[in-house]
């Protein structure tokens, strides 16, 4: 009897134990799944940070950072002869509106200069200081190397912070951890092609931080809103994108204000603000795809605010008051705690909505997202996100409203229905902020990263609420119980295992690819091989040209490519007292921050050869002919006149501008023809070149003549023996008379090639030396020997840095030998060298494919 009682008493214990075991299994699986989620987000963040983006702005940043560290933050621009001058001056004030002149009279010019300075307004000054401070001086002291990867680590760090903020924003919106992690990964993937090492990276991160603060304010405690004060103070000093916070605070405050009013006042206030604003937008921009989307958004918000007001999330009147106060405090703080004070604010509007703002935005990154011919970044993931978000919103709205209405009617009729699930409230402010950020990205693709950051948590919220509501509805129809069904353990286990396998697959794949691209041998350069060099394509920058400028103490004014300006400034030795660089730029990538529109258009006009070059190209294009030598002489004469007009005596151009364009681009690449014209002008001589840059000087100036003569008398200094032999080869082959001198030039070219087996010395040999009959046998033997040596050492060289240069040199040599064989009517050799060329071209294509990311 005792045994039977004991046995009966043990049965409930067994059931309880099973329940505990089952509960523990679910709990353990959840913990494992969270770890996998974090690993997935880190893997996708790592992948997002590996994209290669050219870094023109990065070098500008380091030049500016050095200036600010050494001389403080001011509006005196030190790098260019054509930049804004510090002010305002009394002459400038005379051109101001009457109300501005009245204020100046009342407070005094000194006060105006302090609180609204003009000149060089560097909104990114703190980022520039951070960039410069992160780099050890040993990395750039000599000027022809840059081994530091500190800025690469900075990039990884800010985007890890970003993905953490995006994840917790989604969690605060009620999204399941798995779904939240998936959309965090998608956010990083969407913005990947736009994530580079530049000040905008801070804005991308701070958008995520800002949205997390809004979510904390809404779902945790309204006092979190005060965090925007320190965030915006930091933000306004690292990047001009801080204005995003104030723009998005307007709908955040406005919509929460509407939700706290009664239905009547909500309808009145919304309609008297939203519709006039929509009319203003349409009158300015017209009916375009982005404005059409904005119109739809205004209508949807009107419906939600009027008919579904009780279902809206609200922070209450206390939250509204705190948000208004925090926004006001943040605004005042950004003016007080910024070295440019009010100008930091007004400058943002000048470059965004002023008369000439559109002119500055005619660059690739400012163009619309869905301009598929745009070479900057890719908008395909953004298009997927856009379609997914639109579909999710539409289905979410339909299903949520339909199921809630249907269940609402039945629960009123049947009071005994068990309710365990509450229909979610609608967070209009967060939804609107996500939608507006998408609108920004549709208009300008540079905003795609922040659109992904703002929208992905919202899209995840739509899907999460959609799935939960459908599950609750099905459960209600079947069991008359309003509750979300629990996913079976085996299904959860399958999803976790599938997720783990996916994370492992992508982690291993991208890890191996990272090793191959960033850690293994680098074919594009034999020396500039750090991760930073590869990721930013900075190996193309004028390292050795800048060293040449520094060693020969060049001063005055120069003409340069837009994208090279920042590096040239950083590569010089500034005046220790003023920070002014000796050789002043014509233009650089700081654009409207440092230059007037007229200066930019002047640079464009000269870079394009003016109206004369355009007319010459138009006529040649009409005839389908190449430009003649006479055409180039005319272009060169015009260039000479323009450069002298602005006291320019140095011109530095990337080799890309000197390379013959494809036939389809021949009549459009005006910069190529401009450089060709300059080369044919006898007053402008080449004094420095390599595989990446060419530097010309005006020999009618004493400085230019001294540099040119120094090639022959040894007084002009060069960074290394390769460059000195290369320029001597050019000088002797072009300008010295007699075959003995030409032979000497050929020998210089051979020495240069032995020091750096690359295209530049090879081209000097086959394009110039081969023109002289007595050198052709030497040239032919040299090319044959190199082809043989390349074949013997190819497998070894393929594992070394700079392999691409050797392949390209081999292609050029085989091309020359093919032409020699044609002249000799040696069909076998012609076919052999054609096969060699095809092999080299295939290898170049392969290297370009496997060493890009």
Question: Which positions does each model-derived feature cover?
Answer:
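Transmembrane-helix signature of polytopic, membrane-embedded enzymes
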Residues: 166-189
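Membrane-interface alpha helices of multi-pass inner-membrane proteins
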Residues: 187-191, 212, 225-240, 274-284, ...
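Specific aromatic-rich, kink-prone transmembrane helix
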Residues: 61, 165, 190, 202-220, ...
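Membrane-interface transmembrane helices that cradle and orient dolichyl/undecaprenyl
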Residues: 210-225, 255-265, 301-304, 390-396, ...
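C-terminal luminal/periplasmic domains and tails of membrane-associated envelope-modifying transferases
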Residues: 3-6, 516-563, 573-584, 590-853
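Juxtamembrane membrane-water interface segments that cap and precede transmembrane helices
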Residues: 104-107, 121-132, 139-143, 346-384
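Short hydrophobic alpha-helices at membrane interfaces in multi-pass membrane enzymes
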Residues: 216-233, 263-276, 322-326, 428-435
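Transmembrane-helix motifs of polytopic, lipid-linked glycan transferases
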Residues: 153-173
């Amino acid at each position: 009897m005792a045994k039977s009682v004991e046995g009966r008493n043990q049965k409930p214990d067994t059931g309880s134990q099973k329940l505990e075991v089952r509960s523990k299994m679910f709990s353990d699986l959840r913990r494992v799944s969270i770890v996998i989620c974090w690993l997935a987000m880190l893997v996708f963040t790592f992948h997002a940070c590996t994209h290669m983006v050219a870094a023109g702005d990065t070098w500008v940043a380091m030049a500016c950072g050095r200036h600010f560290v050494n001389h403080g933050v001011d509006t005196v621009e030190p790098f260019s002869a054509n930049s804004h001058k510090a002010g305002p001056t009394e002459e400038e004030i005379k051109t101001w509106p009457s109300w501005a002149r009245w204020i100046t009279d009342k407070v005094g010019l000194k006060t105006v200069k302090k609180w609204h300075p003009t000149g060089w307004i560097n909104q990114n000054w703190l980022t520039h200081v951070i960039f410069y401070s992160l780099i050890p001086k040993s990395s750039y002291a000599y000027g022809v190397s840059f081994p530091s990867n500190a800025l690469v680590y900075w990039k990884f760090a800010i985007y890890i912070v970003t993905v953490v903020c995006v994840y917790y924003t989604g969690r605060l919106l009620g999204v399941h951890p798995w779904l939240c992690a998936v959309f965090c990964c998608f956010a990083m993937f969407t913005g990947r092609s736009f994530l580079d090492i530049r000040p905008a990276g801070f804005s991308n991160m701070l958008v995520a931080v800002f949205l997390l603060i809004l979510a904390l304010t809404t779902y945790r405690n309204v006092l979190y809103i005060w965090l925007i004060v320190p965030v915006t103070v930091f933000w306004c000093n690292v990047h001009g994108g801080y204005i995003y916070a104030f723009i998005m605070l307007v709908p955040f405050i406005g919509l929460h204000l509407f939700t706290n009013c009664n239905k009547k006042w909500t309808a009145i206030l919304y309609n008297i603000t939203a519709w006039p604003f929509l009319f203003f937008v349409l009158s300015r921009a017209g009916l375009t795809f982005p404005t059409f989307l904005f119109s739809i958004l205004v209508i949807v918000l009107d419906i939600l605010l009027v008919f579904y007001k009780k279902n809206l999330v609200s922070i209450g009147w206390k939250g509204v008051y705190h948000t208004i106060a925090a926004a006001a405090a943040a605004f005042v703080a950004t003016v007080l705690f910024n070295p440019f004070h009010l100008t930091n604010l007004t400058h943002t509007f000048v470059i965004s909505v002023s008369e000439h703002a559109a002119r500055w935005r005619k660059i690739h990154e400012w163009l619309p997202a869905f301009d598929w011919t745009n070479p900057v970044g890719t908008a395909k993931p953004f298009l997927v996100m856009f379609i997914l978000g639109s579909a999710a919103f539409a289905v979410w709205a339909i299903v949520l409203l339909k199921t809630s209405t249907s269940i609402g009617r039945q629960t009123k009729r049947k009071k005994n229905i068990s309710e365990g699930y509450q229909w979610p409230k609608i967070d209009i402010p967060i939804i609107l902020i996500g939608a507006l950020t998408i609108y920004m990205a549709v208009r300008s693709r540079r905003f795609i990263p922040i659109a992904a950051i703002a929208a992905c948590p919202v899209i995840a919220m739509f899907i999460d609420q959609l799935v939960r509501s459908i599950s609750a509805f099905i459960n209600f129809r079947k069991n008359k119980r309003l509750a979300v069904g629990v996913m079976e353990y085996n299904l959860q286990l399958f999803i976790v295992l599938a997720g783990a396998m996916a994370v492992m697959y992508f982690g291993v794949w991208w890890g191996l690819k990272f090793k191959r691209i960033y850690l293994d041998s680098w074919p594009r350069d034999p020396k500039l091989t750090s991760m930073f060099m590869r990721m930013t394509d900075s190996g193309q920058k004028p390292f050795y040209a800048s060293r040449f400028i520094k060693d020969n103490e060049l001063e005055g004014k120069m003409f340069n490519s837009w994208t090279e300006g920042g590096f040239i400034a950083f590569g010089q030795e500034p005046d220790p007292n003023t920070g002014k660089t000796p050789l002043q730029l014509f233009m650089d990538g700081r654009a409207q921050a440092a230059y007037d529109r007229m200066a930019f258009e002047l640079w464009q006009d000269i870079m394009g050869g003016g109206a004369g070059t355009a007319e010459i190209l138009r006529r040649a294009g009409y005839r389908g002919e190449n430009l003649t030598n006479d055409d180039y002489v005319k272009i060169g004469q015009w260039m000479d006149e323009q450069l002298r007009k602005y006291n320019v005596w140095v011109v530095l151009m990337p080799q890309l501008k000197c390379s013959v364009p494809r036939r389809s681009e021949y009549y459009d690449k005006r910069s190529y023809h401009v450089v060709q014209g300059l080369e044919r002008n006898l007053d402008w001589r080449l004094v420095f070149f390599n595989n990446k840059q060419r530097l010309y000087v005006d020999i009618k100036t004493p400085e230019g003549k001294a540099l040119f003569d120094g090639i022959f008398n040894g007084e002009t200094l060069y960074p290394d023996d390769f460059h000195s032999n290369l320029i001597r080869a050019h000088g002797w082959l072009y300008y010295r008379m007699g075959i003995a001198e030409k032979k000497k030039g050929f020998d210089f070219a051979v020495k240069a090639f032995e020091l750096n087996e690359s295209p530049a010395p090879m081209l000097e040999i086959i394009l110039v030396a081969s023109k002289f009959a007595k050198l052709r046998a030497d040239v032919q033997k040299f090319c044959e020997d190199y082809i043989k040596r390349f074949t013997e050492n190819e497998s070894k060289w393929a594992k070394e840095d700079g392999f691409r240069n050797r392949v390209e040199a081999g292609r050029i040599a085989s091309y020359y030998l093919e032409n020699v064989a044609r002249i000799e009517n040696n069909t076998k050799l012609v076919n052999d060298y054609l096969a060699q060329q095809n092999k080299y071209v295939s290898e170049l294509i392969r290297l370009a494919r496997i060493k890009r990311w």
